[in-house]
């Protein structure tokens, strides 16, 4: 129980004791005896009663002639007054009883007391505790001392450049003479920018664990709350505390909550958040000296930060913490696998190859899911099977094996996924097929997984055209074999449209329109940007853009239709294999293409194979025709858009 709550309880107990004491005191009767009504009438008839006072609740307060006072209670008796008069008793009628003064005072004070207590309670909750009700202008930053943070730079992997930048900051704080002797100045601020989950906050924790100096940590959203002026006051208080503890480090997580561009959006530019930002700008690089204070901030939206915040003198360094490459992913997996028992068949390098685009948080979640799966199966070690399943679960969602799928839907899904896989397998510029399944997972009824053979920072025009053709493979397979199309290709068609439009309007891959970017990026008001931009091209150009997009998709559709028609047996074989086995891997896809079955036939005596050797071509398919079709498609996907 907090100090504030204890005080409130104490005050309430004191008030209750006071009320009880007064009530007990006022209820005492001083030298008054109780007299029954019969006894009272007898006393009256014996002429021993001097006077009575009758109250409005039938109560009787009387006085005997010997001076004794008494109380009695009279039932409804119409002859009572006459009896009293006949016996010479002085009669007085008492007015209605008024409550005691203290009762009136207490009745008026209780609502006020309740309101005051409620106000104090709300203020205490608003400020998150701390024992002081009116401390909302104070900084809520947490001071991390030595030993409080167990994370070090050894726990950070996959972001070597960012780690090196921050290691230099820590080294300056530990040995400033090394830098000052040659005239170097430590950066006043370091901005960590990158996608979510790449390790920005982890790097800050590593700095806190390694620095050996006071480390203040606060979130950008902690500056601004419900009162005007609180944000600026908290910024001042934060830097005041930092100056007292210099040299030190201030870490502001999610700085975009307070550092967004000023003067943008609706409603003008004078609001509480902007005043907080102005105060932050002054504290970081104003007239006052902040020697020995280094500010580190993290955000995944550097594009919406105010330019004044990013200039040298405030955040001198902007460190990009991007998604890790192959080597980085392997290093991250090794860090997260330290406390997990892995079986001998687990190869972290293979896992790293199969997880392009994964962030550090994704990889940590992957190994954790693998550990949970192994525990669910009562295993003592984590095998490669659990890691593979966890990888797909993180990417696509959990399997839905209990989901009831009709035979018609299973057949449609099998041909749909076979269409994707066959086009990807036959086109040279498409990513190789890794796995095909018709088991529902997440929101998908089935999926075809393709993995690049190497890390890719860019995509060529040929690869983009191949991606369009692979995406169309599912819809075209449905139309060719089932003579029907379904809504299952909605996501594929969206991907096709987006890629084709980007090729024409963003990447300048159209010979008709040339290397020009059409249309400015639309920024949303809540991101701190302008409300929008006008289209920067004419209606004639808009018509040409639509025509080019349509032409790209139409050509791809025709090419894929021809490819799948020429390899119809391959399509049937793969669909049947999926219906039977539900999941096939890359080796099975290759065997289906060569032998018409998922398993490689037993080795026979070697023989010289001609260009159109029927032993490696599916039965019923013209080898020359198949070879020429693939070659034609390869050439088509490489040609420039005309």
Curated annotation (Swiss-Prot):
One of its GO terms (molecular function) is ATP hydrolysis activity. Residues 626-642 have a biased composition (Polar residues). Binds 1 zinc ion per subunit. Keywords: ATP-binding, Cell membrane, Hydrolase, Membrane, Metal-binding, Metalloprotease, Nucleotide-binding, Protease, Transmembrane, Transmembrane helix, Zinc. Its EC number is 3.4.24.-. It is found in: Cell membrane. Residues 1-6, 123-642 are cytoplasmic. Residues 28-101 are extracellular. It comes from the Bacteria. It is a multi-pass membrane protein. ATP binds at residues 194-201. One of its GO terms (biological process) is protein catabolic process. Residues 597-642 are annotated as: Disordered. The active site is at residue 417. Gene3D superfamilies: 1.10.8.60, 3.30.720.210, P-loop containing nucleotide triphosphate hydrolases (3.40.50.300), Peptidase M41 (1.20.58.760). Zn(2+) binds at residues 416, 420, 492. SMART domains: AAA (SM00382). Its cofactor is Zn(2+). NCBIfam families: FtsH_fam. Acts as a processive, ATP-dependent zinc metallopeptidase for both cytoplasmic and membrane proteins. Plays a role in the quality control of integral membrane proteins. In the central section; belongs to the AAA ATPase family. In the C-terminal section; belongs to the peptidase M41 family. Homohexamer. This is ATP-dependent zinc metalloprotease FtsH. It comes from Veillonella parvula (strain ATCC 10790 / DSM 2008 / CCUG 5123 / JCM 12972 / NCTC 11810 / Te3) (Veillonella alcalescens).
């Amino acid at each position: 129980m907090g100090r504030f709550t204890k005080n409130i309880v104490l005050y309430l107990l004191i008030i209750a004791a006071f009320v009880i004491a007064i009530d007990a005191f006022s209820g005492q009767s001083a030298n008054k005896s109780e007299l029954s009504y019969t006894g009272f009438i007898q006393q009256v008839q014996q002429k021993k009663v001097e006077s009575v006072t009758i109250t409005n609740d039938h109560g009787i307060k009387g006085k005997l002639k010997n001076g004794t006072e008494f109380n009695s209670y009279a039932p409804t008796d119409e002859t009572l007054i006459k009896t009293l008069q006949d016996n010479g008793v002085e009669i007085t009628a008492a007015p209605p009883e008024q409550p005691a003064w203290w009762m009136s005072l207490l009745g008026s004070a209780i609502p006020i007391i309740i309101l005051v207590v409620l106000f104090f309670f709300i203020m205490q909750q608003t400020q998150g505790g701390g024992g002081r009700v009116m401390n909302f202008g104070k900084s809520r930053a947490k001071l991390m001392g030595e030993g409080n943070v167990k994370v070090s730079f050894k726990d950070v992997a996959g972001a070597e450049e960012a780690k090196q930048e921050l290691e230099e900051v820590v080294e300056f704080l530990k040995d400033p003479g090394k830098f000052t002797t040659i005239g170097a100045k430590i950066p006043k601020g370091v901005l960590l920018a990158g996608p979510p989950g790449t390790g920005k906050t982890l790097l800050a924790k590593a700095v806190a664990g390694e620095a050996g100096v006071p480390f203040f940590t606060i979130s950008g959203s902690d500056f601004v709350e419900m009162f005007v002026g609180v944000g600026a006051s908290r910024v001042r208080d934060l830097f005041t505390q930092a100056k007292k503890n210099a040299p030190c480090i201030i870490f502001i997580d999610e700085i975009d909550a307070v550092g967004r561009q000023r003067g943008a959006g609706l409603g003008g530019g004078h609001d509480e958040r902007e005043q907080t930002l102005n105060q932050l700008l002054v504290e970081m690089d104003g007239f006052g000296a902040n020697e020995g204070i280094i500010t580190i901030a993290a955000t995944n939206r550097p594009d919406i930060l105010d330019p004044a915040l990013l200039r040298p003198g405030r955040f001198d360094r902007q460190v990009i913490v991007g998604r890790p490459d192959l080597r980085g992913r392997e290093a991250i997996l090794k860090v997260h696998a330290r406390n997990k028992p892995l079986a001998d068949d687990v190869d972290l390098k293979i896992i790293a190859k199969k997880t392009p685009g994964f962030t550090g948080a994704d990889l940590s979640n992957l190994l954790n899911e693998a550990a949970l799966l192994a525990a669910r199966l009562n295993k003592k070690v984590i095998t490669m099977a659990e890691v593979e399943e966890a990888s797909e679960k993180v990417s696509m969602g959990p399997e839905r094996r209990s989901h009831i799928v009709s035979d018609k839907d299973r057949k449609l899904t099998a041909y749909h996924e076979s269409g994707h896989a066959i086009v990807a397998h036959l086109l040279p510029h498409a990513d190789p097929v890794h796995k095909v399944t018709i088991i529902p997972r997440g929101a998908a009824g089935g999926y075809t997984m393709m993995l690049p053979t190497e890390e890719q920072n860019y995509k060529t025009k040929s690869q983009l055209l191949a991606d369009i053709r692979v995406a169309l493979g599912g819809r075209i397979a449905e139309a060719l074999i089932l003579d029907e199309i379904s809504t299952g290709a909605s996501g594929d068609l969206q991907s096709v449209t987006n890629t084709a439009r980007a090729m024409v309007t963003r990447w300048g891959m159209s010979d008709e329109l040339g290397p020009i970017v059409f249309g400015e990026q639309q920024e949303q008001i809540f991101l701190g940007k302008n409300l929008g931009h006008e289209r920067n091209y004419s209606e004639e150009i808009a018509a040409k853009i639509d025509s080019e997009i349509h032409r790209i998709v139409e050509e791809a559709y025709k090419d894929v239709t021809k490819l799948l028609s020429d390899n119809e047996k391959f399509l049937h074989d793969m669909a049947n294999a999926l219906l039977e086995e539900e999941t096939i891997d890359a080796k099975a896809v290759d065997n289906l293409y060569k032998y018409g079955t998922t398993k490689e036939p037993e080795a026979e005596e070697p023989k010289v194979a001609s260009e159109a050797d029927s032993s490696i071509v599916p039965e019923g398919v013209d080898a020359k025709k198949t070879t020429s079709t693939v070659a034609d498609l390869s050439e088509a996907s490489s040609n420039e858009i005309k």
